[in-house]
Design a protein with these regions (language model features):
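Solvent-exposed interaction patches of small proteins and small membrane subunits
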Residues: 1-119
Length: 119
């Protein structure tokens, strides 16, 4: 499958799944435990990469309909974690995962439920 063969629905489902995985990986952890658990850190970072790449590929029409979703910030975070190999700030990763992702996931769930048919 070529990149352009994927639909908005697929990209949104990628975002939804990655957000669910981050929530699953971090449930029950505090920041100190998170930053010491390199497997969890790596898994969370990988899923932020997926979120950002998928967010970049969602059609502008959908993004304009839902301007409260931080589409650009999702991609920006993806770039930060993908290219700053040794300079990743775990506090930022933790903050986004624990304070912003739950609401963002609800927003993505809403888009999938309301808008997506055969995009």
């Amino acid at each position: 499958m070529k990149k352009n063969d994927r639909s908005n629905k697929m990209y949104l489902e990628d975002i939804q799944l990655a957000m669910s995985r981050i929530a699953e990986y971090t449930t029950g952890l505090d920041f100190d435990h998170f930053k010491k658990d390199y497997k969890t850190v790596d898994a969370v970072i990988r899923n932020f990469e997926i979120i950002g790449e998928a967010a970049k590929r969602v059609d502008d029409q959908i993004k304009q309909m839902y301007p409260d979703i931080p589409w650009e910030e999702m991609y920006y975070l993806r770039n930060r974690v993908s290219h700053e190999y040794f300079g990743i700030d775990y506090e930022i990763i933790w903050d986004v995962a624990s304070n912003y992702l739950p609401q963002n996931k609800l927003q993505i769930d809403e888009i999938i439920e309301k808008e997506i048919t055969d995009y």
